[in-house]
Every structure is written in C-alpha cells, then in structure tokens.
Amino acid sequence: MPIIIISSDSYETGREISKKIAKATEYNYVDREILAPIAEKFNLQKGQVIKALEETPSLFGLSAKLRNRLLACIEEATVGKLLGDNVVCHGLAAHLYVLGVSHLIKVRVLSDSKKLASQLSSEAGGSADKIETLLKRKVKKRKQWSLDAFGLDETDPSNYDMVINLSQIDQDEATKNIAGMTVYRKFQPITYSINCLKNKDLACRARVVLMEQFPDVKVRADGSTIVVEVKIKKRTKQKIAGVIKKLAGGVNGVEYVEVHAASDFR
C-alpha cells in the first residue's frame, strides 16, 4: 500500500489531520514520538533533536555539524519506519528527504487562516497587523530552514502531490480526499519504488555510521553496493578509503563500498 507523508504550516494542524487519516486508512501513524528513542539510541539530547527539525544553525543554537548529524539520525529512523508500509508520517520532514519513491504520497496541508491567526493571537497577543507579520515570518522561517537543511522549499506547492487549504475545506472532507488517493494506481508500490526506498534505508544507515568521523559524507546505495563521497586529500585518499570501507562494511546489508573524493558539497 502507498505511504502518506503530511507536511503542514502548523505542527498541531498536521498532527490532527494525520491522525484522522491514519484512523480512516487503518495505517500506522509515525510522528515525533520516535524522537525520544532516537535520542536514546544515539546518545543525544531530545531537545536538540527537536531543534534540528525547527531551527537553522546559529552562533547561540545548534552548530551546522551537530544539526546535520541530528537530521541524519532522524532520517535513518524515519526511513526505517516507512519500510514497514501502510504508514502515515508527519512531523519528521520526510517530504524533504524521501525522494524518487513513487508509492509515496506527499500532501501539504494549509491551516485554516482564521484558526491559525487565533492560535498565534492567544500565544503572542497583539493587533491583526502584528499577527499577519508573525504569520509571514513563520512561513519565511520554514522556507529558510528547509532550504538550508535539504535544499528544497517546503512551502513550494510543486513539491507535493496534493495541497489542501483548510480555509476552503473541513478536516473530515480533507481526510476523505487524502485517504482516497491510496487507491490510485500511480501510487501503488512496484518493485522499482520499493527498491528505491530500501536503497535509501541502506544509505541512511551507512551515513549515520560514517558521520561520526566524516561529518560531510554523502552516501547513496544500489542494492548491496554503497557509494561514499567524502572530502579527502589525494595523499590520504587510500588510508581514508580503507577506514570508510571498514566502517561501512560493518553495516548490515552492505557488501561492496566505493569511495569517491568529492570537492563540491552543498
């Protein structure tokens, strides 16, 4: 069955409608409840793991190196959950890093503007103009975060299969429409798309292992082969390649490792 990934301009709105979709489809629901186990598994602070999903690196916040490691750990855990199929996923930014998987339905849910404004008003107070400014700032912040973290603008409608505005349709009807997409032929799992997700899973698991020593590493997988791109100097390439092959070779499912020297990293 297809996998449904929900992105929203409000975490609360996204969570609410995602739970309804999971109930309607009888799918498993995956959200930020997995962050605590992630923090425990990788010896991280849960607060930092949450920050990685919400904040760009800064002098007084997370460093870029730590943020990237945190996001890699989140990716690894999330993709592992998606392999289970029959999943509604929300709150983990999967719409930005699970790409090229045709049985994955990406949906952007825009909150009821009046409800969102009321929520911000109760939290921050102020005039209608102030609330409008806060809303624009929030959208800009999420755009900056997604571009910095994954090179994609999560506010861009073209990154989704469906965009629903809850100012125009109620949640129950939206739930029905989203759940109805699971029967579309184009979203049914095929061997190629299933293998794409398996490749993503293997690459994520290998990357997490390698990042402790090689923070800027990039990994892609094809079957049991992984290709590793890392910044290395020519004179140390052979030695570093040996270290990488030993580390990556210990990852379950990896049978062959290629190491490429890379000079261009985003």
Short names for language-model regions:
Residues M211-R235:
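Short edge beta-strands and adjacent turn/loop segments
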Residues A206, R235-V259:
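Short, non-transmembrane amphipathic alpha-helical segments
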Residues D129-Q171, K198-L202, R207-V208, D216:
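Small-molecule kinase domains that catalyze NTP-dependent phosphoryl transfer to phosphate-bearing small molecules
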Residues D170-Q188:
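Short, structured interface segments
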Residues L35-N86, G126:
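ATP-dependent small-molecule kinase phosphotransfer cores
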Residues I4-I21:
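Glycine-rich phosphate-binding P-loop
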Residues G100-E123, I131, L135:
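Conserved phosphate-donor/acceptor-positioning beta-strand/loop module used by diverse small-molecule
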Residues Q188-V217, K239, V243:
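N-proximal, solvent-exposed amphipathic alpha-helical segments enriched in charged/polar residues
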